[in-house]
Amino acid sequence: MTNMKSVEAYQQLDNQNLKKVVGGKYYGNGVHCTKSGCSVNWGEAASAGIHRLANGGNGFW
């Protein structure tokens, strides 16, 4: 993670500019969706499933 910007390097968006941002939705369990469809990160999905089983059916998201 050495290629991340410092907090000071990011520009804060106001509400007007935030409305222009186009992005997808991340569900916290390895699934994320955009306009073109959904995809699964199977490693993360499996890990989320194991955590859910270990926590008695309570997810960590």
UniProtKB/Swiss-Prot annotation:
InterPro entries reported for this sequence: Bacteriocin_IIa, Bacteriocin_IIa_CS, Bacteriocin_IIa_dom_sf
Principal location: secreted
Intracellular or extracellular location(s): Secreted
UniProt KW keywords: Antibiotic, Antimicrobial, Bacteriocin, Disulfide bond, Plasmid, Secreted, Signal
Cystine pairings recorded for this chain: 33-38
Gene3D superfamilies: 1.20.5.130
One Pfam entry name: Bacteriocin_II
Signal peptide region: 1-24
Keyword hit for Phosphoprotein: no
Gene Ontology BP term (one): defense response to bacterium
Gene Ontology CC annotation, any one: extracellular region
Function comment: Bacteriocin active against Listeria monocytogenes.
Family label: Belongs to the bacteriocin class IIA/YGNGV family.
The protein's name: Bacteriocin mesentericin Y105
Gene that specifies this protein: mesY
